[in-house]
Amino acid sequence: MKTLVLGSTSPFRKTILEKLQLPFHCAKPNVDETEQKNESPQALVERLAIEKAKAVSSEYPNALIIGSDQVAVCEEEILGKPHNFDNAVVQLNKFSGKSITFYTGLCVYDSEKDKTIALVEPFIVHFNQLSQKDIANYLNAEQPYNCAGSFKSEGLGICLFSKLEGDDPNTLIGLPLIKLVGLLKQHGIDVLAEQSKLTV
């Protein structure tokens, strides 16, 4: 099997990829993540996923490199990180009783063949009606000030939601695993077939 590389230092993406039980390396991509003028959220995450995968190709010239990027959008506005309690309160008040769409760009890049396959996977989070007490209790417990949207869906943030809507819960955490299996197959890697080789 060709070397598999995750173009990310995110511990959450690493944990998700480990579910496939394939050996892989992690590499940090140096990419300018500034959005371009009039760029849609979907176009932004697809472009950045591709750029992140290609950014580590000089280190791994004969590999399949996975790139991923995610933004959260509410009422057509890309959500930033709150950085402090007061900003987080404003964000969560805005989300109360509403929904947020996460767009995750996913790319698998064959650095030997210069072949790129990419897609964008949406995932929708519906929020409960949140009281000021709910918001304060949550923020004091989890302090998600470095998280876009002011919550950690993989932690206590789940208490804020009324419903999750999407094809793959891994997408919400940053790596659409079902779609990744399909992209790897298009690049010639059958994840289940590789398991039999690994156990020999």
From Swiss-Prot:
Q: What does this protein do?
A: Nucleoside triphosphate pyrophosphatase that hydrolyzes 7-methyl-GTP (m(7)GTP). May have a dual role in cell division arrest and in preventing the incorporation of modified nucleotides into cellular nucleic acids.
Locate the transmembrane regions by residue number.
none
Naturally occurring in which organism (per UniProt): Colwellia psychrerythraea (strain 34H / ATCC BAA-681)
Which keywords belong to this entry? Cytoplasm, Hydrolase, Nucleotide metabolism
* Source species, domain of life: Bacteria
The family note in this entry says:
Belongs to the Maf family. YceF subfamily.
Q: Which Pfam families match?
A: Maf
The record lists the catalysed reaction(s) as: N(7)-methyl-GTP + H2O = N(7)-methyl-GMP + diphosphate + H(+)
Matches recorded under InterPro entries: ITPase-like_fam, Maf-like
Provide the protein name.
Answer: 7-methyl-GTP pyrophosphatase
SUPFAM superfamilies, per this entry? ITPase-like (SSF52972)
Q: Does the keyword rRNA processing apply?
A: no
Give its localization: Cytoplasm
Cofactor list = a divalent metal cation
Q: Location of site Important for substrate specificity?
A: F12, Q70, E154
